[in-house]
Amino acid sequence: MASFNVPIIMDNGTGYSKLGYAGNDAPSYVFPTVIATRSAGASSGPAVSSKPSYMASKGSGHLSSKRATEDLDFFIGNDALKKASAGYSLDYPIRHGQIENWDHMERFWQQSLFKYLRCEPEDHYFLLTEPPLNPPENRENTAEIMFESFNCAGLYIAVQAVLALAASWTSSKVTDRSLTGTVVDSGDGVTHIIPVAEGYVIGSSIKTMPLAGRDVTYFVQSLLRDRNEPDSSLKTAERIKEECCYVCPDIVKEFSRFDREPDRYLKYASESITGHSTTIDVGFERFLAPEIFFNPEIASSDFLTPLPELVDNVVQSSPIDVRKGLYKNIVLSGGSTLFKNFGNRLQRDLKRIVDERIHRSEMLSGAKSGGVDVNVISHKRQRNAVWFGGSLLAQTPEFGSYCHTKADYEEYGASIARRYQIFGNSL
């Protein structure tokens, strides 16, 4: 891989995509995973073909010809959101972590590479990410697009949870650079609890919480509407979530403290879509909205299992010989784990569950237990943990040997993408 340029990391999530180069501390671009295409029957602009002309000719390989694809009538990211009411329809090609619209995903990657990163794919190795339990057919589709449409030099598809574990090594709380741990990954659309043992995901023990950042935003919005605030738009609710919300130690005590505060409402300035500035009151939604992770019944009648209990269930359903390692290294990943005191609350509640089980066991057996170390790791890379873990991996000299190359693809076909070597502890 020495003759190739710096590897490219692309982490495409349900809500946002992160793009950048290996070895960097942060992605170069972060924007929504959304594409705007011309609505059926809308006037002006050429129709977008299912496969742009440059993709049909493998030998072109010139940046100038590829940049001409910017003229195609579709937009991605923030540019797409701006076109929502201008005769374009929006589509989110990834739902709950899985790619559902491959045609739109291919176009999304096209502009990601040629408009934003402005790179020649044949000169770079790529690291792409995938959710746990991603169907092997999805890996094949990804490999086919990357090698056939973009002619990339090499490809590695990594499980997001493993990369998040690697990213946690930057925390001072991590004393052992191990790829054994439990990843709590909460983004915009869904929350996954994923146990990993020596770099391998324990697929049978993965559990999902259908509550995440978007649900917190909707909950904030509903509380604003209940008070008839002058601005209860989704955008304002999202800003309040990100800037004002926090996790409290005890919801009952927090309500009691809130009621005693004379200045209980924060004055929050927002700007409406018409450009007029308005002030709204932000009250108990600051601590009540993130509480849905710990008391989900306040927002959902379908899912009632709190996050700490779910994490405990994941560890207890894993092989007994790795359980201590899974409790000892619980790593937070994703923007929805960034609420103040989120990690402290999760560790306290989970420790309480574990200690109660140990106490019951001691009462029944009459023997004294040595206890279990429960450690929830928060770190400064949480928001972009998956991308940063990929950046760490791809900058190592060994990375090229983990990748499948264009020559491998041409010899064996897309099925080679079904398996990738676990990169172990070489970071």
UniProtKB/Swiss-Prot annotation:
Localization of this protein: Cytoplasm, Cytoskeleton, Actin patch
GO molecular function, one term: actin filament binding
Major localization listed first in the record, in broad terms: cytoplasm
Membrane found in the keyword field: no
This protein's UniProt keywords: Actin-binding, ATP-binding, Cytoplasm, Cytoskeleton, Nucleotide-binding
GO cellular component: actin cortical patch; Arp2/3 protein complex; cell cortex of cell tip; cell division site; cytoplasm; cytosol
UniProt-listed GO biological process terms: actin cortical patch organization; actin filament branching; actin filament polymerization; Arp2/3 complex-mediated actin nucleation; endocytosis
Top-level lineage group: Eukaryota
Function field: Functions as ATP-binding component of the Arp2/3 complex which is involved in regulation of actin polymerization and together with an activating nucleation-promoting factor (NPF) mediates the formation of branched actin networks. Seems to contact the pointed end of the daughter actin filament. May be involved in cytokinesis.
Family statement drawn from the similarity comment of this UniProt entry: Belongs to the actin family. ARP3 subfamily.
Subunit text: Component of the Arp2/3 complex composed of arp2, act2, arc1/p41-ARC, arc2/p34-ARC, arc3/p21-ARC, arc4/p20-ARC and arc5/p16-ARC.
Protein name per its UniProtKB record: Actin-related protein 3
Organism: Schizosaccharomyces pombe (strain 972 / ATCC 24843)
Lineage: Eukaryota, Fungi, Dikarya, Ascomycota, Taphrinomycotina
